[in-house]
């Protein structure tokens, strides 16, 4: 999706992209860059018609959307699988991602089994060959400790403040919000002020926002640790609109801007590959 598709995926376009080689269709609830939820119900109907599995990436919003009847997802929407990250808004240790299957008939497709290994019969139910038991125990303990009521309350507050931030920002001249986010992430840009100038202003007030590309924008994730301070975001943006335009760019914004303008993305990939070589060199 792009900034001009506030209504989310163009369903008719999806129909034409499904072929005999399509193994799965993936939808987001919500997507990471803009916090927008795909039209999962309609996508599910198409997947049913074409007999293609539908996976929903709910890693970012799984612990938020499921407590709001207007945006929650369900396997009844012709969904085959759902991914959720408890280590995000479940607040458990990193590395506790979940893959939920509609039924046991589908699940064996993720198994790895070899019967003729010299070390014996080897089987794993997931990509990691083994899992640390303490990770599973800690995840379970924290979920039980926080409790269902905590997650319901957290979800309600985050959705409420995300909608408030959206309604406040769209009133600010020259500042544009991408789509109409209603979960926990919001992305914005300016049709007048360079992104670098906006970033500098936020950093002066100890806010570090993530830089997105295609299109270039900033996004913020609303959490229990910052929702009480979201008025600062609108205050900073209001202050920016009183400034003169400054066109200098520096830091990450320069890198992202350069990468977006390079037509051959293979070059970008090679540069990043060299960077990873340097950072992992012994």
Language-model segments: residues:
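Short beta->alpha junction loops
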Residues: 1-6
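Active-site phosphate-binding strand-loop segment of PLP-dependent enzymes
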Residues: 7-55
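Active-site C-terminal subdomain of aminotransferase-like
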Residues: 23, 50, 55, 71-183, ...
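Conserved short loop/turn motifs at secondary-structure junctions
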Residues: 28-33, 184-188, 219-220
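Active-site-proximal loop/turn and secondary-structure-junction residues that shape catalytic pockets
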Residues: 31, 60-62, 88, 215, ...
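Conserved, charged catalytic cores of large soluble enzymes
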Residues: 62-68
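Non-catalytic terminal extensions of PLP-dependent enzymes
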Residues: 152-154, 162-164, 170-173, 188-282
């Amino acid at each position: 999706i792009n900034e001009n598709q506030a209504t989310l995926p163009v369903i008719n376009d999806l129909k034409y992209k499904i072929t005999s080689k399509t193994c799965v269709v993936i939808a987001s609830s919500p997507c990471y860059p803009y916090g927008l939820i795909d039209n999962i119900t309609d996508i599910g109907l198409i997947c049913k018609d074409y007999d293609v599995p539908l996976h929903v990436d709910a890693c970012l919003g799984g612990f938020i959307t499921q407590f709001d009847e207007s945006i929650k997802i369900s396997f009844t929407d012709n969904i085959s699988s759902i991914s959720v990250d408890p280590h995000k808004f479940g607040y458990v240790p990193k590395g506790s991602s979940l893959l939920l299957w509609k039924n046991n008939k589908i699940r064996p497709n993720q198994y790895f089994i070899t019967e003729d290994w010299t070390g014996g019969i080897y089987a794993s139910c997931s990509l990691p060959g083994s899992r640390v038991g303490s990770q599973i125990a800690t995840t379970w303990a924290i979920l039980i400790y926080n409790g269902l009521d905590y997650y319901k309350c957290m979800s309600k507050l985050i959705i409420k403040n995300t909608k408030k931030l959206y309604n406040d920002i769209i009133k600010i001249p020259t500042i544009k919000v991408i789509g109409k986010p209603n979960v926990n992430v919001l992305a914005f840009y300016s049709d007048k002020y360079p992104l670098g100038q906006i970033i500098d202003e936020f950093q002066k007030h100890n806010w570090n926002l993530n830089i997105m590309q295609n299109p270039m924008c900033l996004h913020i994730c609303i959490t229990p640790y910052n929702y009480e301070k979201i008025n600062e975001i609108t205050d900073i943006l209001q202050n920016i609109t009183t400034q003169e335009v400054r066109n200098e760019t520096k830091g990450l914004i320069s890198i992202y801007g350069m990468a977006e303008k390079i037509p051959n993305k293979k070059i970008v990939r090679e540069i990043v590959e060299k960077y990873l070589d340097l950072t992992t060199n012994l």
